[in-house]
């Protein structure tokens, strides 16, 4: 069996991250013979961290044979440590009255 690939995903509990994680764990992204370790980053906010824990439980419940491990954190250094691939998908949606430049400034913080 191949060595696991470490995949860091930002915004892991968001809509885009959530949709990607199950595809990565099932082998749709890297192949049906490539084990993965998911390193999941979410904002240091109670609601986001609770959602991340829920996503991780769902992934565990699926018992994907290629999912060799998971780390959930709000620390970027932990999430990106030894990562082979990084998917930066966390973002804040545009709110009412926001211009694109406002959105860029807000997402830069993330």
Curated annotation (Swiss-Prot):
* Amino-acid positions noted as binding NAD(+) in the UniProt annotation, renumbered to this chain: 11-17, 107
Which reaction is the catalytic activity of this chain? (S)-malate + NAD(+) = oxaloacetate + NADH + H(+)
A Pfam family it matches? Ldh_1_N
Q: Which domain of life is it from?
A: Bacteria
EC assignment: the record states: 1.1.1.37
Mention one GO biological process in which this protein takes part, according to its record: malate metabolic process
Q: Which GO terms describe its molecular function?
A: L-malate dehydrogenase (NAD+) activity
Gene3D superfamilies per the record? NAD(P)-binding Rossmann-like Domain
Q: Which UniProt keywords apply?
A: NAD, Oxidoreductase, Tricarboxylic acid cycle
**Binding annotation for substrate:** 94, 100
Instruction: Write down the top EC class of this protein.
Output: oxidoreductase
Q: What does this protein do?
A: Catalyzes the reversible oxidation of malate to oxaloacetate.
Family to which the UniProt record says this protein belongs: Belongs to the LDH/MDH superfamily. MDH type 2 family.
Give the protein's recorded name.
Malate dehydrogenase
The protein's organism comes out as Stenotrophomonas maltophilia
